Structures are given as C-alpha cells and as structure tokens.
Amino acid sequence: MPPKTKGKGRKAATRKKKKNSSPGVEAEAKHRLVLLEKELLQDHLALQREEACRAKASEDRLKQRLQGLEAELERTQSEGRAVYAEMSRQRQALQKELGTRSKRLEEEVRGLRERLETCQREAKTAREEAERALREQDGTLTELRAHVAHMEAKYEEILHDNLNCLLAKLRAVKPQWDAATLRLHTRHKEQLRRFGLNPLDL
C-alpha cells in the first residue's frame, strides 16, 4: 500500500504540472504515469505472488504437520489398539487361568472334605468299636475275677477238707505208728546188746 500512496503523490504532482505545461510535457507525464502504474501493478503482482508462495509454503508445512500429526495419531491409536488387544488377551488368559485354578481348588476342597468325612466316620467307628471292646473286656475281666474268686473259694474249701481228712487219718494211724516205732526201737536195742553194745553209749 505505500507504493499506491507514492503513486497518488506522483499523480497529484503530474496534474499540477499538467496545468502549467505544454501538450508534449503532458504526453510525457502520461507516459510516465502509465509506467509508474505498470510498475506498481508489477510490484503488487510480485507481492501477491510472494504472499501466495508464502501461503502455499505455510499451507504445505501445515499439511505436512497435519499429516505427521495424523500419522502419529494413527500410530498412537494403533499402539493403543495393540495394547488394548494385548491387555484383553492377558485378561482373558488370566481369567482362564483363574477359572482353571479355582476349579482345581474347588475339586481339591471337595476331595479333602470327602476324605475328612471318611476319616471322621472311620474314627467314629473305631472309637465305638474301641468302647465296645473296652466294655466287653471290662465285662470279661469282671467275669474272670468272679470266676477266680469262686475257684479260690472252692480250692480253699477243697484244701481245707483234704487237710482235715489227712489230719483225721494221721490221728487215726498215729497209735499204730507209735506202737510200730516202739517195737522197732526195742528190737534195735536188743540187737545192739547182742553185739555187746550199750544203746546209751551211742
């Protein structure tokens, strides 16, 4: 826009000169004016081309930047999708593993509960059998003690009867033994005297 202002100033000066000049000078002034206008148009076109080039370069840079941003956005989205897919895969794998582990643990717990119930039943049965065996043993011991006490009483009675019978027999045969002993003693004394021995010296 300064060139236009400059042109206007020249036009005004030319007009002033036109009033005070001859026709030849006026033609020359018009020619100069045309040249100036042409120069101004050329400068204006050059400025427009320069501005257009700068705008085109700026547009190209913006397009390039936009393409870079779009590519980066696409790469980021692709990475995000890849990360999401990987996380989904890992989550599914983890859920599957947890499901398998949970199922295995449930089966182990079920098996342990069954074993515990079996052991409890066996322990209860063994305890009942042991208690029954102890009761039977106590009953048997009681019967044996009673039988032993009865046998001891019987044996003691038989022993006393036998001893009494033996004593009675001894008392019955004692006079006979005493007489036999006396006869034997007398016979020995006579035999000793026969051999010239004194029984009192022996």
Swiss-Prot record:
Q: Which InterPro entries does this entry report, sorted A to Z? A: DRC12-like (IPR033585)
The keyword Cell division belongs to this UniProt entry's keyword annotation: no
List, as start-end ranges, the regions of compositional bias called Basic residues: 1-20
- Specify where the region named Disordered lies, as residue ranges: 1-29
* Entry's Gene Ontology cellular component terms: cytoplasm; cytoskeleton; motile cilium
UniProt superkingdom: Eukaryota
Where along the sequence do coiled-coil regions lie? 54-149
Keywords of the record, alphabetical order, are: Cell projection, Cilium, Coiled coil, Cytoplasm, Cytoskeleton, Flagellum
Question: Where does the record say this protein resides?
Answer: Cytoplasm, Cytoskeleton, Flagellum axoneme
Under the subunit heading, UniProt states: Component of the nexin-dynein regulatory complex (N-DRC).
State the PANTHER family in the record.
COILED-COIL DOMAIN-CONTAINING PROTEIN 153
What is the role of the protein in this entry?
Answer: Component of the nexin-dynein regulatory complex (N-DRC), a key regulator of ciliary/flagellar motility which maintains the alignment and integrity of the distal axoneme and regulates microtubule sliding in motile axonemes.
Which protein family is it in?
Answer: Belongs to the DRC12 family.
The molecule here is called Dynein regulatory complex protein 12
Q: What is the lineage of its organism?
A: Eukaryota, Metazoa, Chordata, Craniata, Vertebrata
- In the UniProt record, what gene is named as encoding this protein? Drc12
